[in-house]
Amino acid sequence: MKVSACGCGKRYKQFHFGDYLGDGLFATLARIMQILSLFTEILIYAVPAVLAITLHEAAHGYAAKRLGDNTAWVLGRVTLNPVKHIDPVGTLLVPGLLLVGGMMPGGSALLFGWAKPVPVNFGRLYNPKRDMIWVALAGPLMNLAQVVAWLIVLKLIILISPESVLGSVAVDVAFAGLSVNMMLAAFNLIPILPLDGGRILEGLLPWKWAVPYSNLERYGMMIIVVLLVSGLLNYFISPFMHVLKVLVQWVAVF
């Protein structure tokens, strides 16, 4: 863009279409690259995230059935069909927004979500207070088991072909599986109802404390949102992610 003067002394701006086209084309290409990058990231995380959430919820239902309550089994929730467990907000919207936000400058790497809770009738368990601990613990333990499985997958990729295009994509998928499962396990172990950690704490507390504690469940999601927005949630999840980092480094070396 140049600035010229006319004979009457007035100045005007002279636009050069080539300059404008160049700037506009660059901006358009940059936007397309951002969209492609986001789409690729979603594809990489899709399978590990669906597996993480599906197996987590199925584990709750299976544990409940083994301990006396077949409610989830009868309702078809003890299944590897992800459609049965998907929650539109917790499984799709929230993780999607966090993923997009994490790609922005200064965005957080925190990624979590939730599925439709598996129905459990604690009164039908053989020992309700004790068994609710095992039912709640089954979900996070399943995620930690998947962390181990993805570590094995990562090691196999490193041994076979880490530098090929397919190997590079497989490494990204493995890292996605590791991070999603560790974050999901850590998030669910937060001792706030209705999360699994809250249910575990409820089972461990004496009755005189467990009852008033269970009454706080109605405020649970509000408390979790406050922790998320304030950044305090990171203090609970960070130690888990540090352990994961150490495990990945160990797998890479040995």
In which residue ranges do the predicted regions lie?
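Hydrophobic transmembrane alpha-helices and their immediate loop junctions
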Residues: 6-8, 15-254
